[in-house]
Amino acid sequence: VKYQRDKKAAEALANTAPETTSEETTVPPEISKDTVPLSVFMRNEAVNGIDKDDLARAAEDAASAASQGDNAENANALPEYIVLNGVKTEAKKALAKIVAADVDDSYNSEAIKADAVAVYTYLKYRNTNFNVSGLNAAETVSDNILNAVSEVFGEYVVYNGQPAFTPTFKLSAGKTTSADVVFGNSFPYLKTVDSASDKNADGYKTEITLTSGELKELANKFDSSINLSGSAKDWVKVTKHDGAISTGVGYVETVNVGGKEISGYKFACELLENKIPSYCFAVSYTSSGDTFKITSYGSGFGVGMSLAGANKMAADGSTYAQILAKYYPGTNLS
């Protein structure tokens, strides 16, 4: 049923005091240890598959329910609890904790709702009976975020009748990119989408400078078989990108480093050790200083919904449904 609601749960939540007072929202929420941000979590599972421990726990839950004579009455039934990082937590509260680790209280409520729907959708997409471990979750949640999550709890994004894969990230390069460029997997609704307002956001452009010696040290640390010799200007060449910025600059699919081709992800995240925040970047060399300048645009993987773009759309009057329809084209809400 479209825009499904659990009225009793909503009433119970309305009568429950939020975990924090509004005054506490000025302090960044504490994040659980030994976890990763949502965007990294999604990327890892897109490339490596759903966490096996979570799948195993889901199978145990199903077996336990079957032994007690419980049937999975409805695949779309709203969960009462989410097992978040090993802790059984009331479902709305758990969802709000994940959202609060992804966006802060300054976000427009419609953008927060869009993020909440995207997160809930991903939890359904994983099909682990709402068991999730290793994911950043805030210890405290503001009234604003808790209320926004409550309003859309149970809604999710569907494609061909099934929960969609709904990655989010902080800030695009002015456009999002296709999933196959960064993740290596293709989804019909994760294609390039214009997000031009992101170009005006704080942190849009980042530049770092490395000497040839520093780059060589990083490359050798990443892979000792990489041979950086001869003219330094030929050491690093972007070999494939999507042209998000221009014909010469975009989200990078492959880079040639010392004759060895690696993915843009491995170059930015592993070789450069996350010194740049985006996978949309350009590399240039200056012989006079024997230095490499690496310029990146945006922040995050660039696939799916730009949270900065969503916030700008919300500020301009768009609803969460309109935001989701833009960043996941061809999908619907259920």
Where are these regions (language model features)?
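Conserved, single-site charged/polar hotspot
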Residues: V1-S334
